[in-house]
UniProtKB/Swiss-Prot annotation:
Source organism per UniProt: Haemophilus influenzae (strain 86-028NP)
GO biological process: fumarate metabolic process
Protein name: Fumarate reductase subunit D
GO MF term list: succinate dehydrogenase activity
Subcellular location: Cell inner membrane
GO cellular component, one term: plasma membrane
Amino acid sequence: MVDQNPKRSGEPPVWLMFGAGGTVSAIFLPVVILIIGLLLPFGLVDAHNLITFAYSWIGKLVILVLTIFPMWCGLHRIHHGMHDLKVHVPAGGFIFYGLATIYTVWVLFAVINL
């Protein structure tokens, strides 16, 4: 018999943020490291152009994506890694996902006020 009122989990939105963070980290952060770590110091990219891009709406969106999603991924990994190591933090999900939410709100305010 199939349960007509299945218990819903709160995990799918968290897994969405975790997956997005892993994807962003793997695909886009190497490009950011290349631009900021190599091209900018060697003068191949003008700093004024980067600053102008950061102040545009698409630049703000890029900053949001490159900062928020990897943080969710990292805190999700720490939360589940501690569980795998048998270190059970009381209300661990609330703590780690709460920190990610606070960070998200903080970054949103910071980037919007650029």
